């Protein structure tokens, strides 16, 4: 009797949870992404630019370069980073787990495809999408679905493709769209197939969600703190390290990066390591091409620079098996080399 009564009492209030989640998603994305990018698209169309390269004018002193880059970077992404942590924690307490299991929890290709589709409105950079992917994994979303969502956010970002068309040309945007779609779907599918789920990866899933552990605010507070502590400190540290190394990763000297296979490989690998805000690959490539970089290394960089980064891979170390993250990073680099290599042939 008691169990039946509690079940009946709980049922009528469940609708507000997903409703609140989607309200936060829509309001947050409108404020952080959709409305600013709408105006930025007109700027890109009129000026054929969306701003200066975030890598320009690196200080020779590594410590100063690290601080300068961290300041510029975090000023650009802090709103999206906060939104990512909020959504990554809310998805653990507001979205019924069986909803996620029916859509993104499947290990078949359907889960990967849905993860890709759900990523399109997000338009987040790889580091801001990482907390959301981590929250999804805590809800037992499959590796394929979570990886597709994580990579699809920056790689298939509709706003970035529009900016790219106006700034670099629609040929670049078309290549990024087609190659990016193949890259996201193929890598997520292969990682799902080749990497076995481990008990260590699945263990955290059961601890945050049950109603018996307290009310909404207490459970959300625990989820928020756990997600913040497991992602943000290492994120900040990794950004500082890469900020110090940027002058060596991306040489801007005239003619330094020519149209050769060596530079295709170098740019593909550097792009997998470095961290940038959303769409920052466009002015980076624009500046480097004006300095003499060839089309093939440019395409390699356009594929890998937004897709993954060392900080985002580290942020997801507790959400995915290590093998899954290594494979993802390696296959993104290979994808960049393939796209750049094909450009050398044609």
From Swiss-Prot:
Record field: transmembrane: 12-32, 71-91, 113-133, 146-166, 167-187, 223-243, 260-280, 296-316, 326-346
Pfam family, one: ArsP_1
Membrane topology: Multi-pass membrane protein
Compartments in which it is found: Cell membrane
Protein name: UPF0718 protein YraQ
Keywords, alphabetical: Cell membrane, Membrane, Transmembrane, Transmembrane helix
Organism: Escherichia coli (strain K12)
Family classification: Belongs to the UPF0718 family.
Broad class of where this protein is predominantly found: membrane
Gene Ontology CC: one annotated term: plasma membrane
């Amino acid at each position: 009797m008691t169990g039946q009564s509690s079940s009946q009492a709980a049922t009528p209030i469940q609708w507000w949870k997903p409703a609140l989640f989607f309200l936060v998603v829509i309001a947050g994305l409108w404020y952080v992404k959709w409305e600013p990018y709408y105006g930025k698209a007109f700027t890109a169309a009129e000026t054929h630019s969306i701003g200066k390269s975030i890598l320009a004018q690196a200080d020779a002193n590594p410590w100063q370069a690290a601080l300068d880059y961290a300041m510029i970077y975090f000023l650009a992404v802090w709103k999206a980073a906060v939104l990512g942590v909020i959504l990554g924690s809310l998805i653990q307490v507001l979205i019924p787990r069986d909803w996620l299991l029916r859509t993104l929890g499947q290990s078949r290709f359907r889960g990967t495809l849905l993860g890709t589709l759900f990523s399109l409105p997000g338009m987040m950079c790889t580091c801001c999408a990482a907390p959301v992917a981590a929250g999804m994994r805590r809800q037992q979303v499959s590796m394929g679905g979570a990886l597709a969502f994580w990579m699809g956010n920056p790689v298939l970002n509709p706003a970035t493709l529009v900016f790219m068309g106006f700034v670099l040309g629609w040929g670049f945007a078309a290549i990024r769209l087609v190659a990016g779609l193949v890259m996201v779907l193929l890598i997520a599918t292969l990682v799902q197939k080749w990497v076995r789920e481990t008990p260590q990866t699945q263990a955290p899933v059961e601890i945050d969600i049950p109603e018996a552990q307290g009310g909404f605010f207490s459970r959300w507070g625990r989820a928020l703190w756990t997600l913040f502590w497991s992602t943000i400190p290492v994120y900040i540290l990794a950004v500082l390290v890469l900020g110090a190394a940027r002058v060596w990763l991306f040489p801007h000297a005239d003619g330094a990066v020519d149209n050769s296979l060596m530079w295709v490989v170098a740019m593909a690998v550097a792009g997998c390591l470095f961290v940038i805000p959303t769409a920052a690959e466009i002015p980076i490539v624009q500046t480097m091409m004006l300095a003499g970089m060839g089309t093939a290394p440019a395409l390699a960089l356009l594929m890998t620079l937004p897709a993954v980064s060392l900080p985002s891979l580290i942020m997801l170390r507790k959400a995915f098996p290590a093998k899954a993250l290594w494979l993802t990073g390696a296959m993104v680099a290979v994808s960049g080399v393939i796209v750049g290599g094909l450009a050398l042939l044609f």
